[in-house]
């Protein structure tokens, strides 16, 4: 499959990160070095696109049997799954050990893992068929930095208390529920990166109490342009202390009885 939208995004991203050549440089060796950097990055982009293309093909193939996603058209998958997943790639920073709760078909962590082979991603989902798909993709794309685990969030959190530098979550739950699911997993000083749409403010207003209980602090809300008409917001929560080990609550209470206020 041709991934022109994703390709353009990755190349433009490299330019914004100062990888493009400065034609006004006074030093030939500096120009040569930047040429080398640009060539190397284009080689990386080719490798990325090969993996993303395989990912797309198998997503569509498995989707016919297991209903992994409602988004299947090539252009939509590139924008709403691939580009959307990697928009906040710059926020990961020094986070090396990252957890994705409710990973579904692998978004956002599989795209992030393709771009960040130096970071370890642990993907968790309670639906076994989704984990089976993720394991297939891990092997197909040789993603040695990805592990998939079949588990309920509550059980996984109890056994992995404050084990991760960061958590990412996309299209999983409202902020009060999401905070209770993820902050117990995050080390002090680590971050939650929550992908949200334009109505994120209402959710934030409802989670001040659970943030206080679980020692989380709103750091920032990062805005990205997904398309000319659509924006994506990533809510960044920092873990500033140790949270009580009794969270998240059992029995699906974080979702059914969220702590609001």
Specify the residue positions occupied by each region the protein language model found.
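Class I SAM-dependent transferase core
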Residues: 3-20, 24-26, 37-94, 132, ...
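Residue-level signal for inorganic ion chemistry
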Residues: 59, 112, 196, 237
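Short loop/edge segments at beta-strand edges and connector loops
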Residues: 72, 150-151, 222
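Conserved SAM/SAH cofactor-binding pocket of Class I
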Residues: 83-171, 179-180
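Helix-to-beta-strand junctions that scaffold the AdoMet/dcAdoMet cofactor pocket
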Residues: 186-187
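Glycine-centered, small-residue-biased loops immediately flanking beta-strands
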Residues: 190
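Short strand-turn motif at the edge of the Rossmann-like AdoMet-binding core
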Residues: 195-199, 223
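SAM/dcSAM-binding transferase cores
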Residues: 205-261
């Amino acid at each position: 499959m041709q991934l022109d939208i994703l390709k353009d995004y990755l190349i433009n991203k490299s330019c914004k990160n100062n990888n493009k050549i400065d034609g006004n440089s006074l030093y030939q060796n500096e120009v040569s070095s930047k040429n080398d950097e640009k060539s190397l990055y284009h080689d990386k982009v080719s490798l990325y696109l090969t993996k993303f293309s395989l990912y797309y093909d198998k997503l569509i193939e498995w989707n016919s049997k297991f209903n992994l996603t409602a988004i299947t058209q090539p252009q939509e998958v590139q924008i709403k799954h691939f580009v959307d997943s990697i928009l906040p790639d710059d926020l990961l920073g020094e986070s090396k050990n990252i957890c994705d709760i409710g990973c579904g078909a692998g978004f956002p962590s599989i795209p992030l893992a393709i771009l960040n082979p130096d970071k370890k991603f642990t993907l968790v989902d309670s639906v076994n068929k989704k984990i089976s798909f993720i394991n297939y993709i891990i092997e197909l794309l040789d993603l040695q930095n990805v592990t998939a685990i079949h588990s309920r969030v509550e059980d996984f959190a109890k056994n992995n208390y404050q084990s991760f530098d960061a958590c990412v979550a996309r299209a999983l739950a409202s902020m009060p529920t999401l905070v209770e699911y993820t902050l117990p997993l995050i080390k002090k000083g680590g971050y939650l990166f929550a992908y949200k749409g334009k109505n994120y403010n209402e959710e934030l207003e409802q989670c001040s109490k659970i943030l206080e209980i679980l020692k989380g602090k709103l750091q920032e809300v990062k805005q990205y342009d997904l398309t000319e008409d659509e924006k994506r917001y990533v809510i960044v929560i920092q873990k500033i202390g140790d949270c009580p080990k009794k969270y998240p609550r059992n029995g699906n209470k974080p979702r059914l009885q969220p702590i609001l206020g």
